[in-house]
UniProtKB/Swiss-Prot annotation:
This is Large ribosomal subunit protein uL15. It comes from Prochlorococcus marinus subsp. pastoris (strain CCMP1986 / NIES-2087 / MED4). One of its GO terms (cellular component) is cytosolic large ribosomal subunit. Binds to the 23S rRNA. The keyword rRNA processing does not apply.
């Protein structure tokens, strides 16, 4: 059998009529319209919003707000500004041990980082785990040197 434009038909069940709910019992979806008997879910204006628990304090409000997340892989440093390095004399070596001796650092738990706040007027040999760009420039401008120590 060949099909022509005047003999084309849609597949059975593909063109289903929309159900008209609440238009009498004989229509098939009358009375309760498929919503069951009584209750909030059978009323008009449904559905309730997501997370609604019938007036009970919902779970998302009962659980405390999450605060103070610990940042994984966070790099913590014991920091010292250049202004504190003014206590050192000409061509002295500045490292964690010398900073602890001069009481500029107290029980350092983390690697040492030098920040660029302040001025350096003397030539120093600074040994630290990290330097800011400005700190490195200021130390080298004063004739000193910056040596990066390996992190352990």
């Amino acid at each position: 059998m060949t099909s022509t434009l005047n003999t084309l038909k849609s597949n059975t069940g593909s063109r289903k009529k929309k159900l008209r709910k609440g238009r009498g019992i004989a229509a098939g979806q009358g009375a309760s319209c498929g919503f069951g008997m009584r209750g909030q879910k059978s009323r008009s204006g449904r559905p309730t919003r997501p997370g609604f628990e019938g007036g009970q304090m919902p779970l998302y409000r009962r659980v405390p707000k999450l605060k103070h997340f610990e940042i994984i892989n966070q790099k913590n440093f014991s920091i010292v500004n250049l202004s504190k390095l003014s206590e050192f004399k000409e061509s002295e070596v500045v490292n964690i041990d010398s900073l602890v001796k001069k009481k500029l650092l107290f029980k350092p738990k983390f690697p040492l980082k030098i920040l660029g706040n302040g001025e350096v007027k003397v030539k120093l040999k600074v040994q630290a785990h990290a330097f800011t760009k400005v700190a490195k420039e200021k130390i080298e401008a004063a004739g000193g040197s910056c040596e990066i120590i390996n992190n352990k």
